[in-house]
């Protein structure tokens, strides 16, 4: 998926490492406006699912509120739901992600494939997480390491997360390259 920067005519891949929180918020808000203009609850449900981890990194409590707003679709008018959702999305995005909130998201992602990991893969994951918590690597680096795992284990729910799209550094290596190198050394 390539994100177009309409003002500059470039793709986000051209300056992926330079994404600011402002640009992340702008991207999410623009996608929400598309959902709102569609006037379809299905689009809002999809938006909520695709942005779950990104919103979680910003504000976990607002993520819960947004989930309840989406779930109220059988009891309320869509126009009311969209207004409430938009207001709470703005509240959620006002909170800046921290190492702690990103670490929480990473642990949620880990839960998707932890049972399928070998002991060595688990160890490598936790080494990366520790490096991130100790500010030795960036969130972009650790996500670039994890992202290929999503495809290896066919975790389509994670593959569609904007969290990976907006925060990872796609040109980085990954944990499987490290493991392959380790295997060839033995």
Give the residues covered by each predicted segment:
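Acidic, Ser/Pro/Thr-rich low-complexity regulatory regions
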Residues: 2-186
């Amino acid at each position: 998926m390539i994100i177009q920067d309409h003002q500059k005519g470039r793709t986000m891949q051209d300056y992926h490492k330079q994404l600011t929180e402002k640009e992340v918020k702008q991207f999410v808000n623009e996608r929400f406006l598309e959902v709102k203009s569609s006037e379809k609850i299905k689009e809002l449900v999809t938006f909520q699912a695709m942005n779950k981890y990104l919103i979680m990194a910003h504000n976990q409590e607002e993520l819960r509120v947004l989930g309840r707003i989406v779930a109220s679709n059988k009891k309320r008018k869509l126009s009311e739901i969209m207004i409430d959702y938009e207001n709470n999305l703005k509240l959620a995005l006002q909170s800046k992600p921290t190492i702690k909130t990103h670490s929480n998201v990473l642990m949620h992602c880990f839960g998707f494939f932890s049972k399928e990991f070998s002991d060595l893969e688990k160890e490598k994951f936790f080494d990366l997480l520790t490096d991130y918590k100790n500010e030795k690597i960036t969130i972009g680096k650790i996500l670039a390491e994890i992202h290929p795992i999503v495809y290896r284990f066919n975790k389509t729910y994670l593959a569609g997360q904007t969290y990976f799209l907006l925060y990872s550094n796609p040109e980085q290596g990954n944990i499987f390259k490290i493991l392959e190198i380790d295997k060839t050394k033995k």
